[in-house]
A protein has these predicted regions:
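Structural beta-sheet core signal
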Residues: 27-29, 96, 126
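Structural beta-alpha unit
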Residues: 62-94, 131-132
Length: 132
């Protein structure tokens, strides 16, 4: 999760899939740590932001009657940490909410989504929130 409006609908979708398949949801927020800092640096503002986002996601999942585990990770780059954690935990599916972003007037998914799509050890579903 990244704190975008797409996260809420993605979690609702994940809850529907988890209930149907008797699965469990694991939501992760990755704090990207600059190379000038130690990887375990306590960046209070980012930690607070991540915890708030995860608390909100947890509330949504609980309202849906879903079992959810949340985790706050710190890494130099979010994409490899998502893939590595998925492999380590043996997840069956990665579901990512994607917001509409443009670069040079063209739709872009940024750097994280393409990396996860290419390197994930499991299936990946992208949820794109409709443009209002």
């Amino acid at each position: 999760v990244t704190g975008t409006p797409a996260d809420e609908e993605a979690i609702r979708l994940a809850c529907g899939l988890a209930k149907k398949n008797k699965g469990k949801i694991w939501a992760v927020y990755v704090i990207t740590v600059k190379r000038s800092l130690p990887i375990d640096a306590e960046i209070e503002s980012e930690i607070r932001k991540g915890e708030d986002i995860l608390d909100h996601i947890e509330t949504i999942a609980e309202e849906q009657g879903c079992e959810i585990e949340t985790d706050l990770l710190q890494a130099r780059d979010a994409a490899p940490s998502i893939v590595d954690e998925a492999a380590e935990r043996g997840v069956n599916l990665i579901l990512m909410g994607v917001s509409y972003k443009t670069r040079f007037g063209q739709f872009t998914m940024g750097e994280v989504v393409p990396y996860v799509l290419k390197n994930a050890p499991c299936r990946v579903i992208l949820y794109h929130q409709p443009i209002v």
